[in-house]
């Protein structure tokens, strides 16, 4: 399976798993987002309990190719607390919906995290020295009587154990009536967007009390509502361009230079529906759960319930590539509707060179598709393969008929085990995959 480096066949092997082994999972421990920073040295996860955990790549292991995929806890902090909206009598969950890193400009790191209503800018900084020798303070912290001070001394910095501090620098609140589903930092690194079901707002990172509404699809009469915004993202190179996807399977590309309110899109990406596949579930499964620009900015990838599509920004009428993630579930849509799995929101990601796309599935399976060779692979995040450098065996699902020895029947898939969140290191073949409450890290096998 090709990875960040290009067309060579890659064997993926187990590196680490984070999180408790218990079958009885606390709701607060369920991972809700996973994101590498721009260098890939840090990996952040958010959970339903409002916590953010940051892992750091082991520095000494970066040189040893077989241990590059080892990450250890760097910082843990409570990003959001549960709140109550007294005006609407609604509980606001603390669950972290999205995390986005800002590019590093100095020794500190910055990230944005959001729950349903409030976005926060966090500063993550290290301290390994502390000042000592104050004139009015004893070494044990007691204050001295100023009249007893006969000589002035210059405080000095003394080494101390490394301490990582997370401090909230900005809180962006009270701008969304509906639940925030996306945040995306602009390529100017000064502004970012936040999207909820019906509106998209543009913020400046320095200004918390004001945002600009750039998309508003709320109808005058809510009974006429036919679609909602499901995801939004800024173009990686063009700071005036962004896209947003809808529950009807369309993607709109907007140019902020055209007008202040981008209600009229510049481009509309939509694939005509195949009449032979039309069913009661067509509209539900065509809803887009994630949209991601390629690093180059030439393509974008969308994920709907059954497939991943890659679109060329210069061609609106159909995707240039379509990859079936779990087509064998088409015959199971009725039962997936009854158990609400049909509404699961799977995310997708690109590798560093845009040559491979990855997304999750059920039974703790995840899928990779090589855009050059058109080969695909299904792998499993499981504790059975948890010896370091154990090579992952490809898995196959048997849709019907006779099942071969290594195949899994579609009827025996566990729909409670699902991989919704995945992330790919921006420069190396290291991937992070979130199962319910565990974070798996895999890397390519180096001979």
From Swiss-Prot:
Signal peptide: none annotated. GO terms for cellular component: cytosol; glutamatergic synapse; protein phosphatase type 2A complex; synapse. WD repeats lie at residues 11-80, 94-174, 175-218, 227-270, 288-325, 347-381, 414-446. The keyword Acetylation applies. SMART domains: WD40 (SM00320). GO terms for biological process: protein dephosphorylation; regulation of chromosome segregation; response to morphine. Substrate-recognition subunit of protein phosphatase 2A (PP2A) that plays a key role in cell cycle by controlling mitosis entry and exit. Involved in chromosome clustering during late mitosis by mediating dephosphorylation of MKI67. Essential for serine/threonine-protein phosphatase 2A-mediated dephosphorylation of WEE1, preventing its ubiquitin-mediated proteolysis, increasing WEE1 protein levels, and promoting the G2/M checkpoint. Has an extended WD 2 repeat that is important for the interaction with PPP2R1A. PP2A consists of a common heterodimeric core enzyme, composed of a 36 kDa catalytic subunit (subunit C) and a 65 kDa constant regulatory subunit (PR65 or subunit A), that associates with a variety of regulatory subunits. Proteins that associate with the core dimer include three families of regulatory subunits B (the R2/B/PR55/B55, R3/B''/PR72/PR130/PR59 and R5/B'/B56 families), the 48 kDa variable regulatory subunit, viral proteins, and cell signaling molecules. Interacts with the PP2A C catalytic subunit PPP2CA. Interacts with the PP2A A subunit PPP2R1A. This is Serine/threonine-protein phosphatase 2A 55 kDa regulatory subunit B alpha isoform. It comes from Rattus norvegicus. The gene is Ppp2r2a.
């Amino acid at each position: 399976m090709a990875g960040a480096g290009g067309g060579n066949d890659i064997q993926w092997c187990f590196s680490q798993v984070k999180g408790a082994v218990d079958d009885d999972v606390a709701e607060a421990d369920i991972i809700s987002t996973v994101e590498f920073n721009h260098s890939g040295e840090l990996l952040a996860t958010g959970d339903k309990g409002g916590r953010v955990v940051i892992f750091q790549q082991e520095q000494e292991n970066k040189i040893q190719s077989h241990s590059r995929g080892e990450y250890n806890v760097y910082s843990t902090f409570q990003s959001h607390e549960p709140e109550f909206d007294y005006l609407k009598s609604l509980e606001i969950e603390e669950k972290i919906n999205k995390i986005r890193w800002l590019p590093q400009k100095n020794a500190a790191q910055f990230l944005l995290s959001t729950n349903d209503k409030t976005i926060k800018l966090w500063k993550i900084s290290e301290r390994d020295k502390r000042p000592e020798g104050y004139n009015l303070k004893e070494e044990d912290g007691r204050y001295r009587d100023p009249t007893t001070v006969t000589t002035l001394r210059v405080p000095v910095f003394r080494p101390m154990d490394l301490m990582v501090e997370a401090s909230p620098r900005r809180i962006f609140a009270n701008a969304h009536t509906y639940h925030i589903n996306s945040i995306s930092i602009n390529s100017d690194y000064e502004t970012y967007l936040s999207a909820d079901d019906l509106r998209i707002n543009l913020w400046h990172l320095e200004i918390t009390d004001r945002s600009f509404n750039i998309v508003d699809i709320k109808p005058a009469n809510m009974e006429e509502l036919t679609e909602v915004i499901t995801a939004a993202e800024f173009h990686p190179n063009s700071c005036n361009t962004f896209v947003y996807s809808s529950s009807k399977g369309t993607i709109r590309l907007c140019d902020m230079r055209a007008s202040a309110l981008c209600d009229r899109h510049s481009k509309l990406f939509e694939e005509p529906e195949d009449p032979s596949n039309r069913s009661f579930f067509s509209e539900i499964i065509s809803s887009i759960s994630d949209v991601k620009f390629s690093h180059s900015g030439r393509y974008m990838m969308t994920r709907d319930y059954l497939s991943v599509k890659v679109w060329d920004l210069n061609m609106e009428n159909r995707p240039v590539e379509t990859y079936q993630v779990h087509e064998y579930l088409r015959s199971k849509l009725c039962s997936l509707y009854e158990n609400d799995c049909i509404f699961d929101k799977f995310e997708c990601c690109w590798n560093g060179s845009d040559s491979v796309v990855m997304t999750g599935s059920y039974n703790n399976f995840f899928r990779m598709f090589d855009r050059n060779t058109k080969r695909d692979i299904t792998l499993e995040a499981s504790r059975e393969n948890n010896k370091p450098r154990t090579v992952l065996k490809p898995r196959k699902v048997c849709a019907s008929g006779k099942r071969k020895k290594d195949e899994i029947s579609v009827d025996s898939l566990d729909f409670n085990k699902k991989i919704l969140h995945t992330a790919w290191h921006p420069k190396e073949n290291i991937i992070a995959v979130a199962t319910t409450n565990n974070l798996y890290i895999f890397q390519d096998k180096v001979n």
